[in-house]
Curated annotation (Swiss-Prot):
Residues annotated as signal peptide: 1-26
Keywords: Fimbrium, Signal, Virulence
Origin species: Yersinia pestis
Function text: Fibrillar structure, part of fimbriae, necessary for full virulence.
Full protein name: pH 6 antigen
Amino acid sequence: MKMKCFAKNALAVTTLMIAACGMANASTVINSKDVSGEVTVKQGNTFHVDFAPNTGEIFAGKQPGDVTMFTLTMGDTAPHGGWRLIPTGDSKGGYMISADGDYVGLYSYMMSWVGIDNNWYINDDSPKDIKDHLYVKAGTVLKPTTYKFTGRVEEYVF
């Protein structure tokens, strides 16, 4: 008699476990197919950067006023948060270098300098072009030689 009671309890426990684990309502798969796909996200086609030397004449000697050495135009109609100009190579630190190896500091009219990050930046999400100038300050002495600046322009988002 005790065996009958145990068997009934075991059957009840098993039924409860199957129902709780979802086995009582398990479905039978009759068809299946694996799927995959790729999608390409393109950069806005209006991203552009133009970096050019001053086209006017610059004379050697002590400069009587601020003198633009390079112009930088950058823009993108795609959403963005801002721009940074990172001096590279010998220009690291924000310098142009002469053919003789002399370093001359450059400044930006529109962008702020962050020395610890070695870059100028501007937080500007406008779709309009930004036209900036890298210049030497009044009083800077320039030699009659060729000066070079190297850098990388980055567009960023937040």
